[in-house]
UniProtKB/Swiss-Prot annotation:
Pfam families, alphabetized: Ribosomal_S20p (PF01649)
Keywords (A to Z) from UniProt: Ribonucleoprotein, Ribosomal protein, RNA-binding, rRNA-binding
Gene name, Swiss-Prot/TrEMBL: rpsT
Biological processes per GO annotation: translation
Protein role: Binds directly to 16S ribosomal RNA.
Annotated spans, Disordered: 1-27
GO MF assignments: small ribosomal subunit rRNA binding; structural constituent of ribosome
GO cellular component, one term: small ribosomal subunit
Name of the protein in question: Small ribosomal subunit protein bS20
Family, per entry: Belongs to the bacterial ribosomal protein bS20 family.
Signal peptide interval: none
Amino acid sequence: MANTKQAQKRARQAEQRRQHNASQRSMVRTYIKRVIKAIQGGDHAQAMTEFKAAQPVIDRIADKDAISKKKAARIKSRLNKRIKALAA
C-alpha cells in the first residue's frame, strides 16, 4: 500500500492508465476478430474493408503504447497474409 500522498496519487494514476489501456487493447482485439470473421466467411472484399478499418486503429493504439509497435506490425502482417491467401 502506498504510504505517502505522492505514492497514493501515482497508484491512482497507474490504475486509471491500466483500465484505459485494457479498454484500448480490447478494442483492437474486436477489430481483429472482425477481420478474421470476414476471412473465415470467404469474402475477400469484406475482409479488405475490415482490414482497412482495423489498420489505423491498431497503429493508433501502438503509438499510445497500449501495445508495442512490433506487436502491431506482427498483427497487421499476419492478417494481410491471410487475406492474400484468401484471394489466391
